[in-house]
Amino acid sequence: MGTKRTDDDDSPPPPGVKRWIISCDESGTGGKPFYGFGSLWSPDQRRGDFAAMITDLRERYRYPYEIKWNKVNDANLKFYKALVESFFKTNYLAFHCLVVRMADVDLTHHSGSWDLARQKHFTRLLTNKIQRCLTAYPERAQTFRIWVDPIQSSYGKADEVVEIIANHVLKKLFGQVRSVDRVFTRDSKDTPSIGLCDVLLGAVMETWQKDSQREAKVELRQWIADHLGWPSLNHDTHKNEVKFNVWYFYDPTAGAPRAVKTEPVKLKYPLPQTVRRASNR
């Protein structure tokens, strides 16, 4: 989105407030059949645990480089498989993405602009998931901080627009002011949570695009699918999935058949009952 706001701060949330860090990335802006947005969710209070996990993996597998889907190869596959395994074993992390088929997008609803369409879909992903989180835990004071890798857009302050629109939508639903406290641009090279989001989103999108590349990537895609109990990543999930959620933005009025089949998730490492119960509210 060409975002410029980078003055993030590490100050803790107010006492009694649970802050979520939502690390975001995009994929498929190069004219491919689908584009998508991913979001990795983590409690702000677990930042230290996440950093320690990444440091341990880097040292164990001697991988000091940027975490990124396009960096996956035979030489570093063990690191990326361990990273994925750690994600699925870590209950406080969750991945939610939105996939849009370009052929289903009616640009007359977006002033003829792909930039605007993508911005709306990105904001829709965030507001939908934040709404579900606020609804699941109505007794809890929550706020949401969003980190985005610079996303392609002709508009230089798109992060601020996302923040304004998201808060407007959420205020109408919940009467709360500034559920999204800020949206910041973060360099993915220095932000492993965005890197992990990029890896998970890249695996989903490459499968949907039918864009097989390196054998290592194919193996990592299957590794992720195995942790979901799926034959492949060529599926979307039911809306209540918490750990790994693929939202296919399908428009049945467009006349085209669904691109994929919805598949129940059977996690290799099941979530605690309390987390699963909250997802069904």
Protein language model features and the residues they cover:
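Phosphate-ester processing/binding pockets and catalytic centers
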Residues: 1-281
